[in-house]
């Protein structure tokens, strides 16, 4: 039984390094989705040039508060869009100026959040690479123990259990990474949708 377990673990360890990164330009990028380091403004905003709004949006506390609220992914997109529409529909407001300030804030905030998520994914990849090497070396050590005469059964059992635990953690992380790989695209889509809501109000 333990020999079969060792064989399975060795097979897993041998395949780990090949599946950590799909793009040779970004060796720590673990996702099947292509890595796009930054959101292009033109891809998410078809409105007027933002100009000074890119620097000035933080000067207005109300803009900053709405940016924080609308950017948060825990807030349903429809609620974020409604908050933006309500904000830009207030009497006497300069929709064009306010809309540009608001989008400039959303663009900066969500781009920063996206970069943080991507950096986190690459940190996990580096940890996974180290974990893969540990699994590989421990598997080889387990095979050596099993081949020894006489076998050290307590040590075999200890190392075998350790390997099962290490592999379980590795697989759990891999499942989490697969889920988190969707987040940058989700952020892109949210930013585009919020930008459209602003544009519809200022057109």
Regions found by a protein language model. Give the residues of each.
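Alpha-helical oligomerization segments
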Residues: 154-203
């Amino acid at each position: 039984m333990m020999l079969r377990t060792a064989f399975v673990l060795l097979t897993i360890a041998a395949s780990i390094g090949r599946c950590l990164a799909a793009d040779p330009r970004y060796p720590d990028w673990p996702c099947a989705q292509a890595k796009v380091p930054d959101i292009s403004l033109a891809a998410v905003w078809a409105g007027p040039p933002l100009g000074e709004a890119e620097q000035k949006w933080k000067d207005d506390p109300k803009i900053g508060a709405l940016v924080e609220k609308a950017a948060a992914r825990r807030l349903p997109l429809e609620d974020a869009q409604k908050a933006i529409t309500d904000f830009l529909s207030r009497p006497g407001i300069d929709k064009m100026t306010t809309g540009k300030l608001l989008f400039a804030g959303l663009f900066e905030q969500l781009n920063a959040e996206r970069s943080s998520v991507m950096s986190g994914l690459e940190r996990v990849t580096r940890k996974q690479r180290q974990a893969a090497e540990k699994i590989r070396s421990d598997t080889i050590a387990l095979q050596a123990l099993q081949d020894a005469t006489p076998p050290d059964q307590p040590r075999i059992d200890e190392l075998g259990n350790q390997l099962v635990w290490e592999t379980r953690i590795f697989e759990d992380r891999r499942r989490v990474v697969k889920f988190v790989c969707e987040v940058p695209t989700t952020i892109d889509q949210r930013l585009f949708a919020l930008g459209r809501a602003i544009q519809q109000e200022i057109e």
